[in-house]
Amino acid sequence: MEYLYTERAHLMCPGMSFGITAEVSAPFDEKRIKDSFAVLAQAHPFLKALLGHDRRSNAYYYDITEISKTELIIKKKMLADLEDAEILREFERLTGYEWNLFNEGMLKASAWKIGETGERTGFLLVFHHLLTDGRGALGLAQELAEYYARGKKPEYAPERLISAENTFPDKNRMPLISRMLVNTANSDWKREKHDPPDYSRYRDFAGEYIKSNKPFHALSRRSREEVKAMTFSCRENGITVNDLLIAQMMTEEGADKIIIASDLRSRLPGYNSGSLGNYSTAFSIEIKKKHKDIYELAKAIHKKVQKTLNDPAALYLILNCYESLEPPLLDASFISVRGCYNSKAAKFIGTMFFGFASPSGHSITNLGKTESVSMTKAYFIPPASPAIKKTLGILTVNGEMTICTSERLHIQMGATGDKERGFHIDSPKQKY
């Protein structure tokens, strides 16, 4: 049985669902679609899981059942291509409320006919963050495409999560100040003697929060030629494409700090290859010095990124915080900041560590590049964390890069946005 450990940070935090869209080079076949998701569930136990709770220990776990818990929706409407606005509208519908994970699975999927005759099939996979991270989601989408188009079955990959016994590499100890703050918050929490936050009460509050804080999504594209030019210029300057994208975001948003997601699979000895679960961290890069040249800014970013990647204490900082905080204190951090729970200790952590008081941060998650005959197109819809103002989700498939923006809008309770969700081709402002 797998228990929530560092994943606990995603349990009582709204807006943490995200999506992968995929266009598969095989005709629409409803029976084949249903069979494909059944096959995925046989390979990945978490697709058959609900949320479980041990009241005595207040531990949450993945309660694996006998059947798939994926909610599959077969759409009748035919779409011209994967960039149809209908897909983003469907994502916003499926993420427009807080899922009840005691009764609902952690994956919801929709499927459409793509093309004039349905000669291709389009999928939207919507993941709760407790199921997996972006890299795991992309892997599942690739397995779906390979089985649906070519009949290639995924290998059985039971999940083996980060745990107290299966923890991080050496030299990842938190800095002294962070340890002191965490220890103080834990002590204050114990002195407050609160009952643990109730999941159902959290869901009621989170549902209202989501209604009044709907994110807006938009897409932009970089053609194969543009991606090639970008890659060449980055190599010439000794930086990565991601360094350049971060520099562009800093420049366009006027931001000094960007939060970056980083995959840890190759660093975790306990990771079971191909399995679902969360095996990523996040860290921030701050550049206060102004740079007129975007490549000089990207070079400064590159140095800071590489320094963090080579410093376990910095790389694992946020995961160490999740691991070290009292679990109910972690549960209460968001709702305490938002006034639904009265804990000074949790409010302090939610404000100072996680930034829940106001969504002012910027972040970027790049799932890299992949080549696939079966999955001809895809893009990544990043989560809209309540701590983040704007997030970029980046995925390059068969040489074409798609950037999806999740930007949180502050609107009145019960109102709905009237902006058209959909695909637009955004010409790059930077010439390469």
Feature annotation, model-predicted:
Residues 13-32, 103-124, 205-269, 401:
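Gly/Ser/Thr-rich phosphate-binding loops and adjoining beta-strand/alpha-helix segments
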